[in-house]
Amino acid sequence: MNTMFKSPKLSPQRLVTLAMLIALAFAIGKLSIPIIPQQLIISPTFIVNVMIGMIGGPIWAFISLAILDIVDNLSSGAGNFIIWWTLLEAVQGLFYGLFFYQKSLSWTNKKDWLHVTIATAIIMLIGSFIFTPLLVQIYYGVPFWAQFAAGRWLKIFEIPIRILVTMAIMPQLQRIPELRKLANFK
């Protein structure tokens, strides 16, 4: 099997940590700010998603973000569960795992800044700029171009914020010995 998709063994400690991170992402997700309802939402959950990818690797991050989306949807009471949204979240989890599993970050390392920039750009391109507008068009009837005209393009300003927050927080968290052990840093 390709080592790119290598995931860690699911130990009880890793399972409990992922479950706690899912709960944390669920709670932090409630702090989301809707700019344009059902279309443009600013959320701080990305930092927890980075941690899930860092600890769980691609496969467990895929599963964890799918579980998070299902729990979030079921608890919302809206009754509008659409499997494609869950798959989109899961695929984003896969990318978080691919980019951040076994990846130690340093504020002073330019290669780490480039790595986080590429990771953030790809994850946001897939999630925020391609598939979310496509799903909104399919399920809510809002044309792709109209979403960008209405303000979806403003998400581009979120990219540098995500990069700065990730590089400010993750190197500090990665200094925790238990987290280093769970993340399998080389």
Curated annotation (Swiss-Prot):
Major location (coarse): membrane
Protein name, as recorded: Folate transporter FolT
Topology in membrane: Multi-pass membrane protein
One Gene Ontology molecular-function label: folic acid binding
Lineage of the species this protein comes from: Bacteria, Bacillati, Bacillota, Bacilli, Lactobacillales
Quaternary structure and partners: Forms a stable energy-coupling factor (ECF) transporter complex composed of a membrane-embedded substrate-binding protein (S component), two ATP-binding proteins (A components) and a transmembrane protein (T component).
Keyword Cell membrane part of the UniProt annotation: yes
Biological source species: Streptococcus mutans serotype c (strain ATCC 700610 / UA159)
Main function: Folate-binding protein that interacts with the energy-coupling factor (ECF) ABC-transporter complex. Unlike classic ABC transporters this ECF transporter provides the energy necessary to transport a number of different substrates. The substrates themselves are bound by transmembrane, not extracytoplasmic soluble proteins.
Entry's Gene Ontology cellular component terms: plasma membrane
Transmembrane regions: 16-36, 47-67, 81-101, 116-136, 153-173
Domain of life assignment: Bacteria
Keywords: Cell membrane, Folate-binding, Membrane, Transmembrane, Transmembrane helix, Transport
Compartments it resides in: Cell membrane
